Amino acid sequence: MKKIELLAMLGESKDIIDYLQRKGTVQVEKCDAPESMYYTDTDSSVSQLERLLQTAENARETISFYSPEKKKLTDSFLPRKEVELSDFYEESEKTDVAMAKCREIIDIKKEIADKKADIIREQTAREALIPWERLDIPPNTTGTRHTEVFVGSLPDECTEEALKAGFAAALPDLTALDCEVVSSSNTQSIIVVICLKKDSRRVYDYLRSLNFVRASGGDNENIKAAMERHGKNIEALSSDIDGDEEKIRELSSYREDIDFLIDFLTIRKDKYEAFKKMSLSRNVFYFEGYIPERYCEKTVKGLE
């Protein structure tokens, strides 16, 4: 490796840095700034480019996931395609469009994630209703003009026979009472108890002694209708996701433009990082670095 020092007019800095980047032979190192020269802070520009680069790479990964590129096994061993300088400048004019497509892809990806989360919520809500499936009245039913209806759950397994026997023992004078166990497991039993209005306080007190929890209020919708609603919501969300995934597959036509955008942003980021290591004055710029010896002569001639 040979050490290289370069002092040139500030107005030529862009062309010189572009040339060195294309050649990729010089490693710029930060050095002590000569007297009357200073360093410029490019951190904000680098950070902005890193965010843009992250967006582009995220979009590229999303395209690859939903629309994998068909390649031969040997393609990974081939060198990257070289781009003529004129073509590079022409393609660089399209980077704004490519970035807009990247943002569109990311937005669609977020919508897919949100809808998948909604599906999980709908499935959870539907599964929570399964123990109540045989209930043929809305869970928030409280009664009629003359009767009180208690719909809710007990914390343990319970049979209808045991429930009726418990009422008979605790409230033997009650004759106008009916109860049903809708479902029962070792963790929960769903029950319905119907009694006369005048007996409702005594019935409720007994149920509370069993740790009865009344069904919470809500829409006047029966369980079957609610389960069907959740099922339809899941189908609609799944259909929307299929449509969103197809949109991403259609946007895979911008794959090459996004690949170029990633390279373009990487070059710009590297340029600003290199520029941060260069000393500037009002009219000139200066930097030090290292270059492989075999490239010295050719690089110097190119710079001259």
Regions found by a protein language model. Give the residues of each.
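Long, charged N-terminal accessory/stalk domains
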Residues: 1-304
